[in-house]
A protein has these predicted regions:
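A general alpha-helix detector
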Residues: 10-14, 85, 169-173, 192-195
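A conserved non-catalytic segment of reverse transcriptases
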Residues: 33, 114-188, 192
Length: 195
């Protein structure tokens, strides 16, 4: 829904802060206004650029928060965004309690004037120290203890839905394999695994 909610007037104001040439702005207006007064078509070459322009100030805000909360090389609050998918991580140290709630509040304050709302089904706070996972860009991420028990690392695994889809493709490749040489079947399976 994010791409459908981008307000053209807000997007044009943000672009006009950087582009002074009236001819270029006229061309940009034609591109943006082609579909009405709200939304940009997903999948086109302009939509990723529009998404980044629309959230540029949000990116700068969370970069400032990241720098402000840094302790040496350790960052207490981190922000990662790809188009309309984003994740904010907060260190689990007991002195940082409440930071996640404040980060979520700041996020909501920043996106409300843009006409963007959080997807409440996908918005959640998790404690990775307790083994909880969170999803981002088709992957589940969870904190896992290193072998030998010395420290942790973040394990990324494809979401269950994606794994099932790949398994179904592999079953189909094998079922249709018939007299196909094994090397060719392996190549097809590898292509399915690579996506």
């Amino acid at each position: 829904r994010y791409f459908d909610t981008i307000r053209h007037s807000v997007l044009l104001d943000k672009i006009a802060k950087r582009i002074q040439d009236p001819q270029v702005m006229g061309l940009v207006k034609q591109i943006i206004k082609a579909g009405g007064s709200i939304g940009v078509p997903q999948g086109g070459p302009f939509s990723p650029l529009a998404a980044n322009i629309y959230f540029n100030e949000l990116d700068w805000l969370f970069d400032a928060i990241r720098r402000k909360t840094a302790e040496g090389e350790y960052e207490a609050v981190n922000y990662h965004r790809f188009a309309d998918d984003l994740v904010i991580t907060v260190s689990g140290h007991h002195t940082k309690r409440g930071w996640a709630e404040r980060a979520l509040q700041r996020l909501q304050e920043q996106i409300a004037p843009l006409g963007v709302e959080l997807n409440l089904e996908k918005t959640k706070m998790v404690n990775t120290l307790n083994g909880e996972a969170f999803g981002f860009l088709g992957f589940d991420l969870r904190r896992v203890r290193k072998r030998g028990g010395d420290g942790n690392f973040i394990l990324m695994t494809p979401k269950k839905k994606a794994r099932k889809a790949v398994q179904a493709k592999i079953r189909d490749i094998i079922a249709r394999g018939g007299a196909t040489p094994a090397a060719e079947v392996v190549n097809r399976i590898n292509a399915a695994l690579a996506g």
